[in-house]
């Protein structure tokens, strides 16, 4: 992958600014937000620490940026089934999403390095603000101004010559019935892999967040709170998981022809999810 020689100044890079976000979202009501709330939000998103990293890595993009993320998190990954990575053709890589941080970074780094940067994530468009990550991202947003373009953006991603990395659950794993597993996998990766003749490679990433995170998510669900409050704590969870070694298991590719009419696309998505959790 080519190195980006463009030098960026601190003023031109995205930095986390909780006060600016709250002022934008709350408008005139911002003045009624207690200062301790603002301070707490800065604390749980680790604003100062992450901004130091973003400044230090401002001239790194793509796989180089992901490598810097791995070093910052002191994350190590033991890989099983490396021989299952296809050398020919375009593939869709699908994985469980236990962490919301290290798993995404590690998959992009490992696959990006193996395929010389020819990988793309389908991600929430908010991540496009990260200059270093943006070249590897296909922004998707099912709500707001981009909702009309959502199918078009997904289409463009799968029609490209890059391998696609997806977390079909959309959200990171939750505790369900005492077991930490992904929520329902969406069928998009099945339908688009069929259309573009991409084999599907199942991946399983071993890891978990704290009990606090899972309990909070379940409490919010029980109370009917639609806003994903647990998401605010993902940066905190990511840093709690520093200095750890994770295990990535790569399964054998599933030929796209497998996804025939004997099951619906949603059923095939569940089938692949089951394959992942058996790895």
From Swiss-Prot:
- One BP annotation, GO: lipid metabolic process
The record ties this protein, via Pfam families, to: Acyltransf_2
Any stretches that span the bilayer, and where are they?
A: none
Q: Which keywords has UniProt assigned to this entry?
A: Acyltransferase, Lipid biosynthesis, Lipid metabolism, Transferase
Annotated catalysed reactions: a lyso-glycine lipid + a fatty acyl-[ACP] = a glycine lipid + holo-[ACP]; N-[(3R)-3-hydroxyhexadecanoyl]-glycine + hexadecanoyl-[ACP] = N-[(3R)-3-(hexadecanoyloxy)hexadecanoyl]-glycine + holo-[ACP]
* Role summary: Is involved in the production of glycine lipids (GL), which are phosphorus-free membrane lipids. Catalyzes the second step of GL biosynthesis, i.e. the O-acylation of the hydroxyl group of lyso-glycine lipids, resulting in the production of the mature diacylated glycine lipids.
Any idea what this protein is called?
A: Lyso-glycine lipid O-acyltransferase
At the highest ranks, the source species' classification is: Bacteria, Pseudomonadati, Bacteroidota, Bacteroidia, Bacteroidales
């Amino acid at each position: 992958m080519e190195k980006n020689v463009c030098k960026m100044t601190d003023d031109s890079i995205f930095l986390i600014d909780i006060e600016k976000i709250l002022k934008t979202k709350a408008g005139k009501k911002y003045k009624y937000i207690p200062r301790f709330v603002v301070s707490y939000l800065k604390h749980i998103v680790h604003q100062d620490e992450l901004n130091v990293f973003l400044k230090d890595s401002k001239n790194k993009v793509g796989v180089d940026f992901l490598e810097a993320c791995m070093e910052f998190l002191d994350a190590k990954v033991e890989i099983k089934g490396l021989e299952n990575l296809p050398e020919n053709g375009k593939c869709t890589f699908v994985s469980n999403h236990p962490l919301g941080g290290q798993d995404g970074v590690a998959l992009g780094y490992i696959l990006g390095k193996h395929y010389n940067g020819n990988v793309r994530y389908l991600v929430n468009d908010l991540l496009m603000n990260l200059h270093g990550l943006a070249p590897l991202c296909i922004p998707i947003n099912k709500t707001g101004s981009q909702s009309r373009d959502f199918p078009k953006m997904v289409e463009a991603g799968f029609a490209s010559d890059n391998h696609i990395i997806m977390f079909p659950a959309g959200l990171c794993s939750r505790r369900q019935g005492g077991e930490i597993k992904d929520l329902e996998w969406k069928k998009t990766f099945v339908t688009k892999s069929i259309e573009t003749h991409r084999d599907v490679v199942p991946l399983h990433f071993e890891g978990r967040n704290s009990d606090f995170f899972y309990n909070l998510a379940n409490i919010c669900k029980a109370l009917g709170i639609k806003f994903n409050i647990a998401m605010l704590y993902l940066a905190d969870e990511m840093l709690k998981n520093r200095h750890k070694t994770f295990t990535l298991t790569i399964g054998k590719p599933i030929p796209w022809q497998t996804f025939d009419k004997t099951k619906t696309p949603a059923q095939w998505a569940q089938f692949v999810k089951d394959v992942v959790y058996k790895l």
